[in-house]
Curated annotation (Swiss-Prot):
Identification of the protein by name: Acidic phospholipase A2 PLA-1
Family, similarity comment: Belongs to the phospholipase A2 family. Group II subfamily. D49 sub-subfamily.
Protein task: PLA2 catalyzes the calcium-dependent hydrolysis of the 2-acyl groups in 3-sn-phosphoglycerides.
Lineage: Eukaryota, Metazoa, Chordata, Craniata, Vertebrata
InterPro entries given in the database record: PLipase_A2, PLipase_A2_Asp_AS, PLipase_A2_dom, PLipase_A2_dom_sf, PLipase_A2_His_AS
Tissue: Expressed by the venom gland.
Amino acid sequence: NLYQFGKMIFKMTGKSALLSYSDYGCYCGWGGKGKPLDATDRCCFVHDCCYGRVNGCNPKLSTYSYSFQNGDIVCGDDNACLRAVCECDRVAAICFGENLNTYDRKYKDYPSSQCTETEQC
């Protein structure tokens, strides 16, 4: 769920999910359209696509099982849908961590009206 995703993001980046990623670029936050603006925004685009492939549970509300082991996020659900949601969140949190060096504050609170030319998953 979004709370668990936020904890993953903080663990991998040291940043608050709400303050740093909830309204960033064209894809970080609710919904999304346009072309990803940078590597961080692309992490969100890929995450949105991943959620779009999940069947059988609500990705934003479903509580899954995971842990942090040796700096890694480990998803631990037997339920296929919950495991898929966890994997979407895990990959995105790692992606944010890998792209911290290109995070650009100018894309925080970016106007959605500037997001055009939507990419397909």
